[in-house]
Every structure is written in C-alpha cells, then in structure tokens.
C-alpha cells in the first residue's frame, strides 16, 4: 500500500492541538524596500550591504519585495493563504529616522 503526501499531511494536521494557529512572518529588511522614501534613513543593514565585498554581488534590500508600495496586494495574498496569524516588523529607521527625537509620521502610517 502506498502512502500519499496528502494522507501524511492529513494525519499531521489531525495530530495538532485544536487551538493550533497557522501563521507566516516577514522581516522588514527582506520585504520593505523604499529605503530612501518618506523620511527613512539608512539602517545598519543598508550600510553593511553597501560596503564593497561584504555581500555577494553587492545585493541589498533597496527594493526587496517592494512591500512598501505593494502592501495591500501582499496582505491580500496572505489572506488567500488562509493563515490565522501574520507577524511583521517595520524598519526602525522608517519610524525613528535619527534614532531619537520626533517620530516619522509617514513611518507610523506605514
């Protein structure tokens, strides 16, 4: 008798507690992009990635997944997944561009 992946998945799901929550998470640097927009200042990662020789091919998060401009579409995709939870982060330099002092209202709005 052959066991299919679907049968194994069904058994796994059935073994989870009733209150188990399926979720996804993102990291600001990996998805936000828009590094020079709406008052955001460079983060430690921006600086590190722009240092020659530190990152293969000089790759960086300047555009990333462009979540800053595509958030409604991204949230709709997450909703379509049918998950229960979504955890995310917002780049601190977007909210607190100077590290102290007044907050960036555009960063809070995002």
Regions found by a protein language model. Name each.
Residues 1-110:
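Non-catalytic accessory regions flanking glycosidase/transglycosidase catalytic cores in CAZymes
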């Amino acid at each position: 008798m052959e066991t299919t992946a679907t049968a194994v998945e069904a058994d796994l799901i059935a073994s989870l507690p009733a209150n188990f929550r399926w979720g996804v998470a993102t990291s600001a640097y990996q998805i936000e992009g828009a590094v020079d927009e709406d008052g955001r200042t460079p983060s430690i990662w921006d600086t590190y990635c722009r240092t020659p020789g530190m990152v293969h091919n000089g790759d960086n998060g300047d555009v990333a997944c462009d979540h800053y401009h595509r958030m409604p579409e991204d949230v709709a995709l997450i909703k379509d997944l049918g998950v229960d939870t979504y955890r995310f982060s917002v780049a601190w330099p977007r909210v607190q561009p100077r590290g102290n002092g007044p907050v960036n209202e555009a960063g809070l709005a995002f």
